[in-house]
């Protein structure tokens, strides 16, 4: 199982990459896609909306289960990955390239929900 050291993570199995412009790119971890199984559907429900850290932003469905995807920080959901919506199984094969949405953090947003790769590895017992 892959857990890249250059990303941040949430306890709810999202990975987070900070871009040069300060926006955050969000996807689900390798561990999450393994637990879900074959992913068949993805939809961002809050595109263009301002959300609070921990709010449900999207849903991802597999042949086994449906799972909510949460905002890692407070901010505005500025983009959804339409390529993943068209081919959701790409999350199974390339979870760290198949990002789900981008969020522009609010000016007062904290990243206290985010943990590093070592802490995430421990949290999943890997």
UniProtKB/Swiss-Prot annotation:
Every Lipoyl-binding domain range: 23-104
Superkingdom as given in the UniProt entry: Bacteria
A Pfam family reported for this protein in Swiss-Prot or TrEMBL: GCV_H
Coiled coil: none
Cofactor(s), names only, from the UniProt record: (R)-lipoate
Cofactor: record remark: Binds 1 lipoyl cofactor covalently.
GO annotation (BP), single: glycine decarboxylation via glycine cleavage system
UniProt keywords, alphabetically: Lipoyl
Gene3D superfamilies: 2.40.50.100
One GO CC term, this protein: cytosol
InterPro entries: 2-oxoA_DH_lipoyl-BS, Biotin_lipoyl, GCV_H, GCV_H/Fam206, GCV_H_sub, Single_hybrid_motif
Positions where N6-lipoyllysine occurs in the chain: 64
Subunit structure and binding partners: The glycine cleavage system is composed of four proteins: P, T, L and H.
Role of this protein: The glycine cleavage system catalyzes the degradation of glycine. The H protein shuttles the methylamine group of glycine from the P protein to the T protein.
Family indicated by similarity: Belongs to the GcvH family.
Protein name as catalogued: Glycine cleavage system H protein
Phylogenetic lineage: Bacteria, Pseudomonadati, Pseudomonadota, Betaproteobacteria, Burkholderiales
């Amino acid at each position: 199982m892959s857990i890249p050291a250059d990303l941040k993570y949430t306890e709810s199995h999202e990975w987070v990459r900070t871009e040069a412009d300060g926006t955050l790119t969000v996807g689900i971890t390798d561990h999450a896609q393994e637990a879900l199984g074959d992913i068949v559907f993805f939809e961002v429900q809050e595109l263009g909306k301002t959300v609070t850290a921990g709010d449900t932003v999207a849903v991802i469905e597999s042949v086994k289960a449906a799972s909510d995807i949460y905002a890692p920080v407070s901010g505005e959901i500025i983009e959804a990955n339409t390529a993943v919506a068209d081919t959701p199984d790409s999350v199974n094969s390339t979870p760290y390239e198949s990002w789900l949405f981008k969020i522009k953090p609010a000016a007062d947003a904290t990243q206290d929900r985010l943990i590093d790769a070592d802490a995430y590895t421990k949290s999943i017992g890997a």
